[in-house]
């Protein structure tokens, strides 16, 4: 469950290491984002010489949350950390690699490019 001011680890090779959520997209009163939801964030920590710099405002899709999520079959999924992947306006990832597992909910939200790059889909 991600909300404004939540900090997330970046799970791709764009050069950003940590981002801070500044807006959850999807309605004026939307408060929380889960796996597969798009957020607007600012880069808080980045590698030198990377494609993104500290202070850049970016779009990202949440791929892991520490808060458990109930699935339609009754099972629950949760991860050890909150993580996101930076995306372009079209929804394609900005990086060329994705690190760590991602949630199956991304498939339902049509983020197929992220699913294909991920090493594991849980």
From Swiss-Prot:
SMART domains: Ribosomal_L14. GO terms for biological process: translation. GO terms for cellular component: cytosolic large ribosomal subunit. Keywords: Ribonucleoprotein, Ribosomal protein, RNA-binding, rRNA-binding. InterPro entries: Ribosomal_uL14, Ribosomal_uL14_bac-type, Ribosomal_uL14_CS, Ribosomal_uL14_sf. GO terms for molecular function: large ribosomal subunit rRNA binding; structural constituent of ribosome. PANTHER family: 50S/60S RIBOSOMAL PROTEIN L14/L23, LARGE RIBOSOMAL SUBUNIT PROTEIN UL14M. Belongs to the universal ribosomal protein uL14 family. Part of the 50S ribosomal subunit. Forms a cluster with proteins L3 and L19. In the 70S ribosome, L14 and L19 interact and together make contacts with the 16S rRNA in bridges B5 and B8. Binds to 23S rRNA. Forms part of two intersubunit bridges in the 70S ribosome. This is Large ribosomal subunit protein uL14. It comes from Acidothermus cellulolyticus (strain ATCC 43068 / DSM 8971 / 11B). The lineage of its organism: Bacteria, Bacillati, Actinomycetota, Actinomycetes, Acidothermales.
């Amino acid at each position: 469950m991600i909300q404004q001011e939540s900090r997330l680890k970046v799970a791709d090779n764009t050069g950003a290491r940590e981002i801070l959520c500044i807006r959850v997209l999807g309605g004026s009163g939307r408060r929380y984002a889960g796996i597969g939801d798009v957020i607007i964030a600012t880069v808080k920590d980045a590698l030198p010489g990377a494609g993104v710099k500290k202070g850049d405002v970016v779009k990202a899709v949440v791929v892991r949350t520490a808060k458990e999520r109930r699935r339609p079959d009754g099972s629950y999924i949760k991860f050890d950390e909150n993580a996101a992947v930076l995306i372009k306006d079209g929804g394609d990832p900005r990086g060329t690699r994705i690190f760590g597992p991602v949630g199956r909910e991304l498939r339902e939200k049509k983020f197929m490019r992220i699913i294909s790059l991920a090493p594991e889909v849980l």
